């Protein structure tokens, strides 16, 4: 999972104006980087130009996904990521960046601004921080921890059982389980195994 580009643009009446952008092109060869950066800048501007105000969209371009959010105040943002990167995290990043940008940069400067004149330096740190969606996004982090816990729990249950022993056999042998509990276990086991392929 990788983020390649994070851009902030102003959607004008005829074209989009790039205000600030940052790129992580380390996965491309040195000789490709300038061409790739130009392509990403062009694509970001084109997507913002063609997006309606107040809209969010994800556009597939080859093996990349371009996530765009254009606010009602004509401020737009684009994240270019690989197809594995979670889109929900991209839109969270765009929300955060555009809110922060609109607080720090006066809206009067948006139509005529350029990367050289706009004083906003947080894009690099946001792109670096969001490279790992699990660390950057609380929801993704909780999901990863939950998946880890399920794996540990499953492994713990397997290790509790002795070699060759099955949970079904233990339930049958148990003196502490009542007949009703044993019947419940068998019924649940049958219902859960109805979809298994033999």
UniProtKB/Swiss-Prot annotation:
Domain annotation v-SNARE coiled-coil homology: ranges: 138-198
Principal cellular location given in the protein's record: cytoplasm
Pfam families (UniProt xref): Longin, Synaptobrevin
Residue stretch(es) of the prosequence: 196-198
CDD domains given in the database record: Longin, R-SNARE_YKT6
Keywords: Coiled coil, Cytoplasm, Cytoplasmic vesicle, ER-Golgi transport, Golgi apparatus, Lipoprotein, Membrane, Methylation, Palmitate, Prenylation, Protein transport, Transferase, Transport
The record's account of how the chain is modified after translation: Palmitoylated; catalyzes its own palmitoylation. Palmitoylation is required for Golgi targeting.
Signal peptide location: none
Localization: Cytoplasm, Cytosol; Cytoplasmic vesicle membrane; Golgi apparatus membrane
Modified residues (Cysteine methyl ester): 195
S-farnesyl cysteine-type lipidated residues: 195
InterPro entries: Longin-like_dom_sf, Longin_dom, R-SNARE_YKT6, V_SNARE_CC
Record-annotated Longin domain positions: 8-131
Lipid-acceptor residues (S-palmitoyl cysteine): 194
GO molecular function, one term: transferase activity
GO biological process: endoplasmic reticulum to Golgi vesicle-mediated transport; protein transport
Membrane topology label: Lipid-anchor
Annotated SUPFAM superfamilies: SNARE fusion complex, SNARE-like
Matching PANTHER family: SYNAPTOBREVIN HOMOLOG YKT6
Biological role: Vesicular soluble NSF attachment protein receptor (v-SNARE) mediating vesicle docking and fusion to a specific acceptor cellular compartment. Functions in endoplasmic reticulum to Golgi transport; as part of a SNARE complex composed of GOSR1, GOSR2 and STX5. Functions in early/recycling endosome to TGN transport; as part of a SNARE complex composed of BET1L, GOSR1 and STX5. Has a S-palmitoyl transferase activity.
Domain comment as written in the entry: The longin domain regulates palmitoylation and membrane targeting.
Protein's recorded name: Synaptobrevin homolog YKT6
Lineage: Eukaryota, Metazoa, Chordata, Craniata, Vertebrata
Gene that specifies this protein: ykt6
């Amino acid at each position: 999972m990788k983020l390649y580009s994070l851009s902030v643009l102003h959607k004008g009446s005829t074209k989009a104006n790039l205000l600030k952008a940052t790129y992580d092109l380390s996965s491309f060869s040195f000789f490709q980087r300038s061409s790739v950066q130009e392509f990403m800048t062009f694509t970001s501007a084109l997507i913002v130009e063609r997006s309606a105000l107040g809209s969010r969209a994800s556009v597939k371009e080859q093996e990349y996904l371009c996530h765009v959010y254009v606010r009602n105040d004509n401020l737009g943002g684009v994240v270019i990521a690989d197809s594995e990167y979670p889109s929900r995290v991209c839109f969270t990043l765009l929300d955060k960046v555009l809110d922060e940008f609109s607080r720090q940069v006066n809206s009067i400067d948006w139509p005529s601004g350029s990367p050289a004149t706009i004083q906003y330096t947080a894009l690099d740190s946001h792109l670096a921080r969001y490279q790992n969606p699990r660390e950057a996004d609380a929801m993704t982090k909780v999901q990863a921890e939950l998946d880890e816990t399920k794996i540990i729990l499953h492994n713990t249950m397997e290790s509790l059982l002795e070699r060759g022993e099955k949970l079904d056999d233990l339930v049958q042998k148990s003196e502490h389980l009542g007949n009703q509990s044993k019947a419940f276990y068998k019924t649940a086991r049958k219902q859960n195994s109805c979809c298994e392929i033999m």
